[in-house]
Protein backbone atom coordinates (compact mmCIF):
# COMPACT_ATOMS: atom_id res chain seq x y z
CA UNK A 1 0.00 0.00 0.00
CA UNK A 2 1.29 3.45 -0.83
CA UNK A 3 -0.02 6.96 -0.53
CA UNK A 4 -0.65 9.43 2.23
CA UNK A 5 -3.57 7.47 3.69
CA UNK A 6 -1.34 4.48 4.63
CA UNK A 7 -0.57 6.00 8.02
CA UNK A 8 -4.13 5.19 9.15
CA UNK A 9 -3.44 1.40 8.68
CA UNK A 10 -1.23 1.09 11.75
CA UNK A 11 -2.19 -1.68 14.27
CA UNK A 12 -2.30 0.75 17.18
CA UNK A 13 -5.54 2.27 15.83
CA UNK A 14 -7.33 -1.00 15.20
CA UNK A 15 -8.49 -1.32 18.80
CA UNK A 16 -10.35 1.94 18.56
CA UNK A 17 -12.20 1.25 15.31
CA UNK A 18 -15.41 -0.66 14.89
CA UNK A 19 -15.81 -3.35 12.26
CA UNK A 20 -17.85 -1.06 9.98
CA UNK A 21 -15.17 1.60 10.07
CA UNK A 22 -12.48 -0.98 9.28
CA UNK A 23 -14.42 -2.13 6.23
CA UNK A 24 -14.82 1.45 5.00
CA UNK A 25 -11.12 2.13 5.52
CA UNK A 26 -10.16 -1.02 3.63
CA UNK A 27 -12.37 -0.10 0.71
CA UNK A 28 -10.79 3.36 0.63
CA UNK A 29 -7.28 1.97 0.75
CA UNK A 30 -7.94 -0.31 -2.20
CA UNK A 31 -8.46 2.68 -4.47
CA UNK A 32 -5.34 3.70 -6.27
CA UNK A 33 -3.94 7.21 -6.17
CA UNK A 34 -4.79 7.71 -9.84
CA UNK A 35 -8.44 6.94 -9.18
CA UNK A 36 -8.50 9.39 -6.31
CA UNK A 37 -6.91 12.10 -8.47
CA UNK A 38 -9.48 11.40 -11.15
CA UNK A 39 -12.27 11.69 -8.60
CA UNK A 40 -10.86 14.99 -7.25
CA UNK A 41 -10.56 16.33 -10.79
CA UNK A 42 -14.16 15.44 -11.57
CA UNK A 43 -15.29 17.15 -8.38
CA UNK A 44 -13.39 20.29 -9.35
CA UNK A 45 -15.03 20.28 -12.79
CA UNK A 46 -18.46 19.89 -11.23
CA UNK A 47 -17.77 22.78 -8.85
CA UNK A 48 -16.58 25.03 -11.70
CA UNK A 49 -19.61 24.14 -13.82
CA UNK A 50 -21.94 24.81 -10.89
CA UNK A 51 -20.39 28.21 -10.21
CA UNK A 52 -20.56 29.08 -13.93
CA UNK A 53 -24.24 28.14 -14.06
CA UNK A 54 -24.85 30.21 -10.92
CA UNK A 55 -23.18 33.26 -12.47
CA UNK A 56 -25.17 32.83 -15.70
CA UNK A 57 -28.38 32.52 -13.69
CA UNK A 58 -27.52 35.75 -11.88
CA UNK A 59 -26.93 37.51 -15.20
CA UNK A 60 -30.19 36.17 -16.59
CA UNK A 61 -32.06 37.31 -13.48
CA UNK A 62 -30.56 40.79 -13.72
CA UNK A 63 -31.39 40.88 -17.44
CA UNK A 64 -34.97 39.82 -16.75
CA UNK A 65 -35.14 42.43 -14.05
CA UNK A 66 -34.13 45.16 -16.48
CA UNK A 67 -36.51 43.91 -19.13
CA UNK A 68 -39.34 44.02 -16.62
CA UNK A 69 -38.94 47.78 -16.42
CA UNK A 70 -36.61 47.89 -13.45
CA UNK A 71 -33.14 49.39 -13.53
CA UNK A 72 -29.85 48.63 -11.86
CA UNK A 73 -28.99 50.45 -8.66
CA UNK A 74 -26.49 53.28 -8.31
CA UNK A 75 -24.23 54.00 -5.35
CA UNK A 76 -24.94 57.52 -4.09
CA UNK A 77 -22.64 59.24 -1.60
CA UNK A 78 -24.40 61.15 1.15
CA UNK A 79 -22.20 63.05 3.61
CA UNK A 80 -23.85 63.97 6.91
CA UNK A 81 -22.70 65.80 10.00
CA UNK A 82 -23.17 64.03 13.32
CA UNK A 83 -24.62 67.13 15.00
CA UNK A 84 -27.06 67.62 12.12
CA UNK A 85 -28.08 63.96 12.40
CA UNK A 86 -28.92 64.42 16.06
CA UNK A 87 -30.81 67.66 15.39
CA UNK A 88 -32.86 66.05 12.61
CA UNK A 89 -33.67 63.10 14.85
CA UNK A 90 -34.96 65.43 17.59
CA UNK A 91 -36.95 67.41 15.03
CA UNK A 92 -38.42 64.23 13.57
CA UNK A 93 -39.50 62.91 16.95
CA UNK A 94 -41.15 66.25 17.71
CA UNK A 95 -43.06 66.14 14.40
CA UNK A 96 -44.14 62.55 15.02
CA UNK A 97 -45.54 63.37 18.45
CA UNK A 98 -47.61 66.20 16.94
CA UNK A 99 -48.63 64.08 13.90
CA UNK A 100 -47.06 66.55 11.47
CA UNK A 101 -45.00 64.08 9.44
CA UNK A 102 -46.76 62.58 6.38
CA UNK A 103 -45.01 59.67 4.68
CA UNK A 104 -44.12 61.66 1.56
CA UNK A 105 -42.29 64.29 3.65
CA UNK A 106 -40.49 61.84 5.96
CA UNK A 107 -37.14 62.76 4.45
CA UNK A 108 -33.88 63.53 6.25
CA UNK A 109 -32.72 66.25 3.88
CA UNK A 110 -36.09 68.01 3.77
CA UNK A 111 -36.21 68.24 7.56
CA UNK A 112 -32.59 69.41 7.62
CA UNK A 113 -33.42 72.27 5.23
CA UNK A 114 -36.18 73.51 7.53
CA UNK A 115 -33.87 73.30 10.54
CA UNK A 116 -31.18 75.29 8.74
CA UNK A 117 -33.75 77.92 7.76
CA UNK A 118 -34.51 78.49 11.45
CA UNK A 119 -30.92 78.11 12.68
CA UNK A 120 -31.67 74.71 14.25
CA UNK A 121 -34.36 76.09 16.57
CA UNK A 122 -36.67 73.06 16.76
CA UNK A 123 -39.76 74.99 17.88
CA UNK A 124 -39.46 77.62 15.17
CA UNK A 125 -38.71 74.96 12.56
CA UNK A 126 -41.76 72.97 13.71
CA UNK A 127 -43.99 76.03 13.31
CA UNK A 128 -42.55 76.63 9.85
CA UNK A 129 -43.13 72.96 8.98
CA UNK A 130 -46.74 73.07 10.21
CA UNK A 131 -47.40 76.20 8.12
CA UNK A 132 -45.91 74.43 5.10
CA UNK A 133 -48.15 71.39 5.55
CA UNK A 134 -51.21 73.63 5.87
CA UNK A 135 -50.21 75.66 2.80
CA UNK A 136 -49.77 72.52 0.71
CA UNK A 137 -53.28 71.38 1.64
CA UNK A 138 -54.86 74.75 0.84
CA UNK A 139 -52.85 75.34 -2.35
CA UNK A 140 -53.22 71.77 -3.68
CA UNK A 141 -49.47 71.42 -4.06
CA UNK A 142 -49.36 67.63 -3.81
CA UNK A 143 -51.36 67.22 -7.05
CA UNK A 144 -50.45 70.44 -8.86
CA UNK A 145 -48.31 68.67 -11.48
CA UNK A 146 -51.26 66.55 -12.60
CA UNK A 147 -53.99 69.15 -12.08
CA UNK A 148 -52.49 72.38 -13.43
CA UNK A 149 -51.77 72.91 -17.14
CA UNK A 150 -49.88 76.12 -17.98
CA UNK A 151 -50.80 76.47 -21.64
CA UNK A 152 -49.33 79.94 -22.10
CA UNK A 153 -45.80 78.86 -21.18
CA UNK A 154 -44.29 79.75 -24.59
CA UNK A 155 -45.69 83.29 -24.49
CA UNK A 156 -44.59 83.72 -20.87
CA UNK A 157 -41.00 82.74 -21.67
CA UNK A 158 -40.87 85.43 -24.36
CA UNK A 159 -41.57 88.16 -21.82
CA UNK A 160 -39.81 86.52 -18.85
CA UNK A 161 -36.74 84.60 -20.20
CA UNK A 162 -35.82 81.83 -17.77
CA UNK A 163 -34.60 78.25 -18.02
CA UNK A 164 -32.68 75.38 -16.48
CA UNK A 165 -29.52 74.62 -18.43
CA UNK A 166 -26.93 72.00 -17.47
CA UNK A 167 -25.25 71.37 -14.13
CA UNK A 168 -22.30 72.88 -12.29
CA UNK A 169 -19.11 71.01 -11.48
CA UNK A 170 -20.68 69.49 -8.35
CA UNK A 171 -23.75 68.25 -10.23
CA UNK A 172 -26.30 70.90 -9.18
CA UNK A 173 -28.77 72.19 -11.79
CA UNK A 174 -28.15 75.68 -13.18
CA UNK A 175 -31.10 78.09 -13.27
CA UNK A 176 -30.80 81.19 -15.50
CA UNK A 177 -32.93 84.35 -15.63
CA UNK A 178 -32.38 87.31 -17.97
CA UNK A 179 -33.99 90.05 -15.89
CA UNK A 180 -33.04 92.82 -18.30
CA UNK A 181 -35.41 91.35 -20.90
CA UNK A 182 -38.40 90.99 -18.56
CA UNK A 183 -41.49 92.94 -19.66
CA UNK A 184 -43.96 92.89 -16.73
CA UNK A 185 -46.76 94.61 -18.65
CA UNK A 186 -46.70 92.11 -21.51
CA UNK A 187 -46.33 89.27 -19.02
CA UNK A 188 -49.52 90.24 -17.20
CA UNK A 189 -51.30 90.43 -20.57
CA UNK A 190 -50.58 86.81 -21.53
CA UNK A 191 -51.19 85.36 -18.05
CA UNK A 192 -52.45 86.32 -14.61
CA UNK A 193 -50.46 86.64 -11.41
CA UNK A 194 -52.26 83.72 -9.77
CA UNK A 195 -51.61 81.43 -12.73
CA UNK A 196 -47.95 82.38 -12.84
CA UNK A 197 -47.60 81.70 -9.12
CA UNK A 198 -49.14 78.25 -9.63
CA UNK A 199 -46.73 77.66 -12.54
CA UNK A 200 -43.83 78.66 -10.28
CA UNK A 201 -44.93 76.17 -7.60
CA UNK A 202 -45.40 73.47 -10.23
CA UNK A 203 -41.83 73.97 -11.47
CA UNK A 204 -40.52 73.75 -7.90
CA UNK A 205 -42.40 70.47 -7.38
CA UNK A 206 -41.08 69.17 -10.70
CA UNK A 207 -37.56 70.03 -9.58
CA UNK A 208 -37.92 67.95 -6.40
CA UNK A 209 -39.60 65.07 -8.24
CA UNK A 210 -37.48 64.92 -11.42
CA UNK A 211 -34.59 67.38 -11.63
CA UNK A 212 -32.93 66.97 -8.23
CA UNK A 213 -33.22 63.13 -8.21
CA UNK A 214 -31.82 63.03 -11.77
CA UNK A 215 -28.87 65.18 -10.73
CA UNK A 216 -28.41 62.96 -7.67
CA UNK A 217 -28.15 59.84 -9.82
CA UNK A 218 -25.89 61.56 -12.35
CA UNK A 219 -23.52 63.05 -9.76
CA UNK A 220 -23.73 60.00 -7.44
CA UNK A 221 -24.17 62.34 -4.49
CA UNK A 222 -27.24 63.89 -2.90
CA UNK A 223 -28.45 67.06 -4.67
CA UNK A 224 -31.29 69.25 -3.38
CA UNK A 225 -30.14 72.78 -4.25
CA UNK A 226 -29.36 74.73 -7.42
CA UNK A 227 -26.94 77.33 -8.77
CA UNK A 228 -28.65 80.48 -10.08
CA UNK A 229 -27.40 83.03 -12.63
CA UNK A 230 -29.23 86.37 -12.88
CA UNK A 231 -28.33 88.55 -15.86
CA UNK A 232 -29.27 92.12 -14.87
CA UNK A 233 -27.98 93.85 -17.98
CA UNK A 234 -30.49 96.55 -18.95
CA UNK A 235 -32.45 96.38 -15.70
CA UNK A 236 -34.19 99.64 -14.81
CA UNK A 237 -37.33 101.01 -13.21
CA UNK A 238 -39.38 99.79 -16.18
CA UNK A 239 -38.66 96.24 -15.04
CA UNK A 240 -39.95 96.90 -11.51
CA UNK A 241 -43.42 98.35 -11.77
CA UNK A 242 -46.10 97.61 -9.17
CA UNK A 243 -47.20 94.29 -10.68
CA UNK A 244 -43.60 93.08 -10.89
CA UNK A 245 -42.95 94.01 -7.26
CA UNK A 246 -46.12 92.25 -6.11
CA UNK A 247 -45.21 89.14 -8.10
CA UNK A 248 -41.67 89.05 -6.71
CA UNK A 249 -43.00 89.48 -3.16
CA UNK A 250 -45.42 86.56 -3.53
CA UNK A 251 -42.81 84.29 -5.09
CA UNK A 252 -40.21 85.10 -2.45
CA UNK A 253 -42.68 84.39 0.35
CA UNK A 254 -43.64 81.01 -1.15
CA UNK A 255 -40.02 80.04 -1.73
CA UNK A 256 -38.81 81.16 1.69
CA UNK A 257 -41.68 79.62 3.66
CA UNK A 258 -42.12 76.31 1.83
CA UNK A 259 -38.88 75.57 -0.08
CA UNK A 260 -36.11 76.84 2.22
CA UNK A 261 -32.39 76.37 1.67
CA UNK A 262 -32.69 75.34 -2.00
CA UNK A 263 -30.22 77.97 -3.22
CA UNK A 264 -26.60 76.83 -3.21
CA UNK A 265 -25.20 80.04 -4.68
CA UNK A 266 -26.29 82.91 -6.94
CA UNK A 267 -24.28 84.90 -9.47
CA UNK A 268 -25.62 88.34 -10.45
CA UNK A 269 -23.77 89.27 -13.65
CA UNK A 270 -23.52 92.44 -15.76
CA UNK A 271 -24.16 94.53 -12.65
CA UNK A 272 -23.46 98.23 -13.18
CA UNK A 273 -22.17 100.69 -10.57
CA UNK A 274 -25.70 101.71 -9.60
CA UNK A 275 -26.72 98.11 -8.99
CA UNK A 276 -23.62 97.49 -6.91
CA UNK A 277 -24.41 100.53 -4.77
CA UNK A 278 -27.93 99.22 -4.32
CA UNK A 279 -26.64 95.77 -3.42
CA UNK A 280 -24.23 97.09 -0.79
CA UNK A 281 -27.16 98.81 0.90
CA UNK A 282 -29.57 95.86 0.68
CA UNK A 283 -26.86 93.43 1.80
CA UNK A 284 -26.89 94.93 5.29
CA UNK A 285 -30.51 93.82 5.75
CA UNK A 286 -29.82 90.19 4.78
CA UNK A 287 -28.65 87.31 6.90
CA UNK A 288 -24.84 86.88 6.62
CA UNK A 289 -25.26 83.24 5.61
CA UNK A 290 -27.64 84.25 2.80
CA UNK A 291 -25.53 87.15 1.59
CA UNK A 292 -22.48 84.85 1.43
CA UNK A 293 -24.28 82.78 -1.22
CA UNK A 294 -24.85 85.79 -3.51
CA UNK A 295 -21.98 87.05 -5.69
CA UNK A 296 -22.49 90.37 -7.50
CA UNK A 297 -20.21 90.46 -10.55
CA UNK A 298 -19.60 93.13 -13.13
CA UNK A 299 -19.10 92.68 -16.83
CA UNK A 300 -15.99 90.49 -16.38
CA UNK A 301 -17.82 87.57 -14.85
CA UNK A 302 -16.74 84.68 -17.06
CA UNK A 303 -13.67 83.60 -15.08
CA UNK A 304 -15.71 83.43 -11.87
CA UNK A 305 -18.45 81.37 -13.55
CA UNK A 306 -15.93 78.96 -15.05
CA UNK A 307 -14.61 78.21 -11.56
CA UNK A 308 -17.87 76.46 -10.71
CA UNK A 309 -19.37 75.64 -14.15
CA UNK A 310 -17.79 73.76 -17.03
CA UNK A 311 -17.56 75.73 -20.27
CA UNK A 312 -19.65 73.10 -22.11
CA UNK A 313 -22.47 73.52 -19.58
CA UNK A 314 -22.55 77.32 -19.94
CA UNK A 315 -24.69 78.89 -22.72
CA UNK A 316 -22.95 80.80 -25.46
CA UNK A 317 -24.67 84.10 -24.59
CA UNK A 318 -22.99 83.89 -21.17
CA UNK A 319 -19.55 83.15 -22.61
CA UNK A 320 -19.79 79.35 -22.68
CA UNK A 321 -19.43 76.85 -25.50
CA UNK A 322 -22.97 75.42 -25.57
CA UNK A 323 -25.42 76.53 -28.27
CA UNK A 324 -28.08 73.78 -28.25
CA UNK A 325 -28.61 74.60 -31.93
CA UNK A 326 -30.58 71.40 -32.57
CA UNK A 327 -33.11 72.28 -29.83
CA UNK A 328 -33.87 75.91 -30.64
CA UNK A 329 -31.24 77.48 -28.41
CA UNK A 330 -30.13 77.14 -24.82
CA UNK A 331 -33.13 78.98 -23.38
CA UNK A 332 -35.51 76.39 -24.85
CA UNK A 333 -33.43 73.20 -24.60
CA UNK A 334 -33.89 72.45 -20.87
CA UNK A 335 -30.55 70.65 -20.99
CA UNK A 336 -29.60 68.45 -18.04
CA UNK A 337 -29.52 64.90 -16.64
CA UNK A 338 -33.31 65.00 -16.40
CA UNK A 339 -33.39 64.75 -20.22
CA UNK A 340 -31.52 61.43 -20.17
CA UNK A 341 -34.11 58.64 -20.75
CA UNK A 342 -32.20 56.09 -18.65
CA UNK A 343 -31.89 58.43 -15.68
CA UNK A 344 -35.53 59.51 -15.95
CA UNK A 345 -36.50 55.84 -16.02
CA UNK A 346 -34.57 55.27 -12.80
CA UNK A 347 -36.19 58.32 -11.19
CA UNK A 348 -39.69 57.20 -12.14
CA UNK A 349 -38.96 53.78 -10.64
CA UNK A 350 -37.64 55.36 -7.43
CA UNK A 351 -33.97 54.95 -8.29
CA UNK A 352 -32.85 58.03 -6.39
CA UNK A 353 -34.52 56.81 -3.18
CA UNK A 354 -33.83 53.09 -3.56
CA UNK A 355 -30.24 53.36 -4.73
CA UNK A 356 -27.37 51.90 -2.77
CA UNK A 357 -26.73 54.97 -0.68
CA UNK A 358 -23.31 55.27 0.99
CA UNK A 359 -23.78 57.57 3.97
CA UNK A 360 -20.72 59.11 5.62
CA UNK A 361 -21.19 60.53 9.11
CA UNK A 362 -18.68 63.25 9.96
CA UNK A 363 -17.77 64.62 13.37
CA UNK A 364 -17.13 68.28 14.18
CA UNK A 365 -13.55 67.98 12.88
CA UNK A 366 -14.69 66.66 9.51
CA UNK A 367 -13.48 63.10 10.12
CA UNK A 368 -15.54 60.09 9.07
CA UNK A 369 -16.74 58.35 12.22
CA UNK A 370 -19.34 56.00 10.71
CA UNK A 371 -20.51 54.61 7.42
CA UNK A 372 -23.92 53.38 6.36
CA UNK A 373 -24.38 51.57 3.08
CA UNK A 374 -28.04 50.75 2.40
CA UNK A 375 -28.41 47.86 -0.01
CA UNK A 376 -31.90 47.85 -1.47
CA UNK A 377 -32.86 44.69 -3.29
CA UNK A 378 -35.08 45.16 -6.31
CA UNK A 379 -38.15 43.05 -5.54
CA UNK A 380 -41.11 42.27 -7.73
CA UNK A 381 -43.66 40.07 -6.03
CA UNK A 382 -41.73 37.44 -4.12
CA UNK A 383 -38.72 37.44 -6.46
CA UNK A 384 -35.74 38.77 -4.55
CA UNK A 385 -32.72 39.88 -6.51
CA UNK A 386 -29.80 37.71 -5.58
CA UNK A 387 -27.71 39.32 -8.26
CA UNK A 388 -27.28 42.51 -6.35
CA UNK A 389 -26.46 40.79 -3.12
CA UNK A 390 -23.91 38.78 -5.03
CA UNK A 391 -22.37 41.90 -6.50
CA UNK A 392 -22.14 43.38 -3.04
CA UNK A 393 -20.24 40.33 -1.88
CA UNK A 394 -17.86 40.59 -4.82
CA UNK A 395 -17.11 44.23 -4.03
CA UNK A 396 -15.96 43.41 -0.50
CA UNK A 397 -12.62 41.74 -0.37
CA UNK A 398 -12.08 40.77 3.22
CA UNK A 399 -14.03 38.03 5.03
CA UNK A 400 -14.87 40.47 7.83
CA UNK A 401 -16.55 42.82 5.40
CA UNK A 402 -18.56 39.98 3.88
CA UNK A 403 -19.61 38.88 7.35
CA UNK A 404 -20.89 42.38 8.13
CA UNK A 405 -23.27 42.14 5.17
CA UNK A 406 -24.74 38.81 6.25
CA UNK A 407 -27.58 40.35 8.29
CA UNK A 408 -29.27 43.07 6.26
CA UNK A 409 -31.82 45.31 7.90
CA UNK A 410 -33.33 48.70 7.19
CA UNK A 411 -32.85 51.31 9.88
CA UNK A 412 -34.38 54.78 10.21
CA UNK A 413 -32.36 57.89 10.87
CA UNK A 414 -33.02 57.88 14.60
CA UNK A 415 -30.78 54.81 14.88
CA UNK A 416 -28.18 56.54 12.73
CA UNK A 417 -28.06 59.28 15.34
CA UNK A 418 -27.60 56.65 18.01
CA UNK A 419 -24.75 55.01 16.09
CA UNK A 420 -23.17 58.39 15.49
CA UNK A 421 -23.27 59.10 19.21
CA UNK A 422 -21.83 55.73 20.13
CA UNK A 423 -19.00 56.06 17.62
CA UNK A 424 -18.04 59.61 18.55
CA UNK A 425 -14.95 58.29 20.34
CA UNK A 426 -13.58 56.86 17.12
CA UNK A 427 -11.80 60.06 16.14
CA UNK A 428 -9.42 59.79 19.11
CA UNK A 429 -7.92 56.48 17.93
CA UNK A 430 -5.31 56.67 15.17
CA UNK A 431 -6.10 54.60 12.11
CA UNK A 432 -9.73 54.10 13.06
CA UNK A 433 -11.03 55.93 10.01
CA UNK A 434 -9.22 53.46 7.81
CA UNK A 435 -10.97 50.41 9.22
CA UNK A 436 -14.52 51.60 9.80
CA UNK A 437 -17.00 48.70 9.65
CA UNK A 438 -19.68 48.89 6.98
CA UNK A 439 -23.27 48.64 8.20
CA UNK A 440 -26.29 48.26 5.93
CA UNK A 441 -28.82 50.95 6.73
CA UNK A 442 -31.76 52.54 4.98
CA UNK A 443 -31.51 56.28 5.21
CA UNK A 444 -34.60 58.12 4.05
CA UNK A 445 -37.14 55.91 2.39
CA UNK A 446 -37.91 53.45 5.16
CA UNK A 447 -38.83 55.53 8.16
CA UNK A 448 -42.00 54.34 9.84
CA UNK A 449 -44.36 56.73 11.55
CA UNK A 450 -44.59 55.49 15.10
CA UNK A 451 -44.29 57.46 18.32
CA UNK A 452 -40.93 57.38 20.00
CA UNK A 453 -40.51 59.52 23.07
CA UNK A 454 -37.10 58.36 24.24
CA UNK A 455 -34.02 60.20 23.01
CA UNK A 456 -30.49 59.00 22.64
CA UNK A 457 -28.67 59.79 25.88
CA UNK A 458 -25.19 58.46 25.12
CA UNK A 459 -22.13 60.65 24.93
CA UNK A 460 -22.36 63.07 22.04
CA UNK A 461 -25.96 62.14 21.38
CA UNK A 462 -29.28 63.67 22.34
CA UNK A 463 -30.36 64.19 25.92
CA UNK A 464 -33.79 63.29 27.22
CA UNK A 465 -36.72 65.67 26.65
CA UNK A 466 -36.87 68.73 28.85
CA UNK A 467 -38.87 68.49 32.05
CA UNK A 468 -42.18 70.36 31.82
CA UNK A 469 -41.96 73.75 33.47
CA UNK A 470 -45.62 74.31 34.31
CA UNK A 471 -47.06 73.85 37.80
CA UNK A 472 -48.75 70.59 36.90
CA UNK A 473 -45.37 69.11 36.01
CA UNK A 474 -43.89 70.33 39.30
CA UNK A 475 -46.77 68.78 41.24
CA UNK A 476 -46.25 65.49 39.45
CA UNK A 477 -42.54 65.49 40.30
CA UNK A 478 -43.25 66.30 43.96
CA UNK A 479 -45.82 63.52 44.11
CA UNK A 480 -43.34 61.02 42.68
CA UNK A 481 -40.68 62.09 45.19
CA UNK A 482 -43.21 61.85 48.01
CA UNK A 483 -44.18 58.29 47.01
CA UNK A 484 -40.53 57.29 46.77
CA UNK A 485 -39.90 58.71 50.24
CA UNK A 486 -42.84 56.80 51.69
CA UNK A 487 -41.57 53.56 50.18
CA UNK A 488 -38.09 54.19 51.60
CA UNK A 489 -39.50 54.93 55.07
CA UNK A 490 -41.70 51.83 54.96
CA UNK A 491 -38.75 49.65 53.94
CA UNK A 492 -36.54 51.14 56.65
CA UNK A 493 -39.26 50.63 59.27
CA UNK A 494 -39.69 46.96 58.38
CA UNK A 495 -35.94 46.38 58.40
CA UNK A 496 -35.49 47.96 61.83
CA UNK A 497 -38.41 46.07 63.40
CA UNK A 498 -37.04 42.77 62.10
CA UNK A 499 -33.47 43.36 63.25
CA UNK A 500 -34.18 44.75 66.75
CA UNK A 501 -35.02 41.36 68.43
CA UNK A 502 -32.06 39.65 66.81
CA UNK A 503 -29.77 42.40 68.05
CA UNK A 504 -31.02 42.16 71.64
CA UNK A 505 -30.79 38.34 71.86
CA UNK A 506 -27.36 37.96 70.31
CA UNK A 507 -24.53 37.48 72.81
CA UNK A 508 -21.21 39.34 72.80
CA UNK A 509 -19.40 36.05 72.20
CA UNK A 510 -21.33 35.47 68.98
CA UNK A 511 -20.60 38.99 67.83
CA UNK A 512 -16.92 38.51 68.53
CA UNK A 513 -16.96 35.17 66.73
CA UNK A 514 -18.55 36.74 63.69
CA UNK A 515 -15.92 39.45 63.68
CA UNK A 516 -13.13 36.86 63.90
CA UNK A 517 -14.70 34.81 61.12
CA UNK A 518 -14.92 37.82 58.84
CA UNK A 519 -11.40 38.88 59.66
CA UNK A 520 -9.93 35.50 58.74
CA UNK A 521 -10.21 36.35 55.06
CA UNK A 522 -7.71 39.20 55.23
CA UNK A 523 -6.95 42.60 56.61
CA UNK A 524 -8.91 44.49 53.93
CA UNK A 525 -12.09 42.55 54.65
CA UNK A 526 -11.73 43.09 58.37
CA UNK A 527 -11.46 46.83 57.85
CA UNK A 528 -14.63 46.92 55.74
CA UNK A 529 -16.72 44.51 57.89
CA UNK A 530 -15.94 45.79 61.40
CA UNK A 531 -18.92 45.54 63.80
CA UNK A 532 -21.22 48.59 63.96
CA UNK A 533 -20.87 51.11 66.72
CA UNK A 534 -23.48 50.88 69.49
CA UNK A 535 -26.60 52.97 68.86
CA UNK A 536 -29.42 53.84 71.23
CA UNK A 537 -32.44 51.57 71.03
CA UNK A 538 -35.19 53.00 68.81
CA UNK A 539 -38.74 52.47 69.88
CA UNK A 540 -41.70 52.23 67.56
CA UNK A 541 -43.07 55.53 68.88
CA UNK A 542 -39.87 57.41 67.99
CA UNK A 543 -39.97 56.08 64.42
CA UNK A 544 -43.59 57.06 63.97
CA UNK A 545 -42.89 60.56 65.30
CA UNK A 546 -40.00 60.97 62.86
CA UNK A 547 -42.10 59.82 59.91
CA UNK A 548 -44.99 62.09 60.95
CA UNK A 549 -42.64 65.08 61.13
CA UNK A 550 -41.29 64.40 57.62
CA UNK A 551 -44.81 64.00 56.24
CA UNK A 552 -45.84 67.31 57.80
CA UNK A 553 -42.89 69.08 56.16
CA UNK A 554 -43.71 67.58 52.75
CA UNK A 555 -47.38 68.52 53.06
CA UNK A 556 -46.35 72.09 53.85
CA UNK A 557 -44.16 72.25 50.73
CA UNK A 558 -46.96 70.84 48.55
CA UNK A 559 -49.39 73.38 50.01
CA UNK A 560 -46.97 76.20 49.19
CA UNK A 561 -46.72 75.02 45.58
CA UNK A 562 -50.48 74.71 45.25
CA UNK A 563 -51.04 78.21 46.62
CA UNK A 564 -49.06 79.78 43.77
CA UNK A 565 -51.28 81.06 40.91
CA UNK A 566 -51.41 78.95 37.75
CA UNK A 567 -51.91 81.93 35.45
CA UNK A 568 -49.83 84.98 34.67
CA UNK A 569 -50.81 88.13 36.63
CA UNK A 570 -52.96 90.59 34.75
CA UNK A 571 -50.39 93.40 34.95
CA UNK A 572 -47.64 91.26 33.42
CA UNK A 573 -49.97 90.06 30.69
CA UNK A 574 -50.84 93.66 29.82
CA UNK A 575 -47.17 94.58 29.66
CA UNK A 576 -46.47 91.61 27.41
CA UNK A 577 -49.33 92.51 25.05
CA UNK A 578 -48.12 96.10 24.90
CA UNK A 579 -44.61 94.92 24.03
CA UNK A 580 -45.97 92.68 21.25
CA UNK A 581 -48.00 95.58 19.82
CA UNK A 582 -44.92 97.79 19.94
CA UNK A 583 -42.89 95.17 18.08
CA UNK A 584 -45.59 94.93 15.40
CA UNK A 585 -45.59 98.71 15.00
CA UNK A 586 -41.81 98.77 14.71
CA UNK A 587 -41.92 96.02 12.09
CA UNK A 588 -44.46 97.99 10.08
CA UNK A 589 -42.29 101.11 10.31
CA UNK A 590 -39.25 99.09 9.27
CA UNK A 591 -41.07 97.73 6.22
CA UNK A 592 -42.15 101.24 5.22
CA UNK A 593 -38.60 102.52 5.72
CA UNK A 594 -37.16 99.71 3.62
CA UNK A 595 -39.64 100.46 0.86
CA UNK A 596 -38.81 104.18 0.89
CA UNK A 597 -35.10 103.38 0.91
CA UNK A 598 -35.50 101.03 -2.01
CA UNK A 599 -37.38 103.64 -4.04
CA UNK A 600 -34.76 106.26 -3.17
CA UNK A 601 -31.97 103.96 -4.26
CA UNK A 602 -33.70 103.19 -7.53
CA UNK A 603 -34.14 106.92 -8.08
CA UNK A 604 -30.48 107.43 -7.27
CA UNK A 605 -29.54 104.78 -9.80
CA UNK A 606 -31.55 106.59 -12.46
CA UNK A 607 -29.85 109.86 -11.59
CA UNK A 608 -26.43 108.24 -11.81
CA UNK A 609 -27.30 106.78 -15.18
CA UNK A 610 -28.54 110.20 -16.34
CA UNK A 611 -25.33 111.85 -15.13
CA UNK A 612 -23.28 109.24 -16.98
CA UNK A 613 -25.19 109.94 -20.18
CA UNK A 614 -24.74 113.70 -19.78
CA UNK A 615 -21.03 113.32 -19.17
CA UNK A 616 -20.72 111.07 -22.20
CA UNK A 617 -22.62 113.59 -24.36
CA UNK A 618 -20.48 116.46 -23.08
CA UNK A 619 -17.35 114.45 -23.78
CA UNK A 620 -18.50 113.81 -27.35
CA UNK A 621 -19.16 117.53 -27.85
CA UNK A 622 -15.67 118.39 -26.61
CA UNK A 623 -14.17 115.88 -29.02
CA UNK A 624 -16.09 117.40 -31.92
CA UNK A 625 -14.94 120.92 -30.98
CA UNK A 626 -11.32 119.79 -30.84
CA UNK A 627 -11.63 118.19 -34.26
CA UNK A 628 -13.06 121.44 -35.70
CA UNK A 629 -10.20 123.51 -34.27
CA UNK A 630 -7.65 121.13 -35.72
CA UNK A 631 -9.36 121.27 -39.10
CA UNK A 632 -9.31 125.09 -39.05
CA UNK A 633 -5.57 125.13 -38.36
From Swiss-Prot:
Basic residues bias locations: 42-64
Recorded coiled-coil stretches: 571-593
Gene3D superfamilies named in the record: CRAL-TRIO lipid binding domain (3.40.525.10), N-terminal domain of phosphatidylinositol transfer protein sec14p (1.10.8.20)
Domain CRAL-TRIO stretches: 152-326
A Gene Ontology biological process term: protein transport
Bilayer disposition of the protein: Peripheral membrane protein
Keywords, comma-separated and alphabetical: Cell membrane, Coiled coil, Golgi apparatus, Membrane, Protein transport, Transport
Family: Belongs to the SFH family.
Function description: Required for transport of secretory proteins from the Golgi complex. Catalyzes the transfer of phosphatidylinositol and phosphatidylcholine between membranes in vitro.
Protein name as annotated: Phosphatidylinositol/phosphatidylcholine transfer protein SFH8
Organism: Arabidopsis thaliana (Mouse-ear cress)
Gene: SFH8
